[in-house]
Amino acid sequence: LSGLTCSHLNVMEKGEYRKKAAELGMAIICPDTSPRGEDIPDENGNWQFGSGAGFYLDATESPYDKNYNMYSYIVDELPSVIEKYFDFDMSRQSIFGHSMGGHGAIIMALRNPNKFKSCSAFAPIVEPSTASWSSGAFKKYIGLDQTNWQMYDSVALVKKGYHFPEILVDQGD
C-alpha cells in the first residue's frame, strides 16, 4: 500500500521487488490510496486529505462515505475480484505498505488476522488519531467522535486487544 500523497504508481514504479516477485511466481497487487475523480470539495487541494490521503479507512461522513471506503475495498472487494478472475492461492495473501500504507497494512492485519499470512510496514504511521496533520482528515472522514477513530489507529487497536502473530516494522536508519 502506498503512502500519503501517493498513488498505486509509487509502489509499481519505485519498488525493486518486481524481478524477484516474478522469479518466485508472486503477484503484487497495488491498489490506489484513495478514490480519484469524484470532484468532492477539497479533494485535491490539501496533501493531508482527499486524493492521495484516504488513510485506508471507511468514511462515515457525507460526502466522503459514498466513495472513501478504501478499508473495505482492500479487505473485501479487491480480494473477491482477484479470486474471481485469477487463479491465486488467496490463503497465502500478505499485506505491506509504506507510511500511510504501512498504517493501512497494520490496521487491516490486526483487524483480520486470519486473512493475511504476513504483514510488513515500512516507516508506518502508527497513531494517526493523535497527529495534527492526520486528525483533520479523520474528522472529515469519520466525524468528531474520536472513539470511532480507534478502529483505524493501530495503537488503539493493540490496546483493545487486537493481535496479529508477527508484524515486521522497519523505520530505516
Task: Give the predicted meaning of each segment.
Residues 1-173:
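Non-catalytic cap/lid and distal C-terminal segments of serine-dependent acyl enzymes
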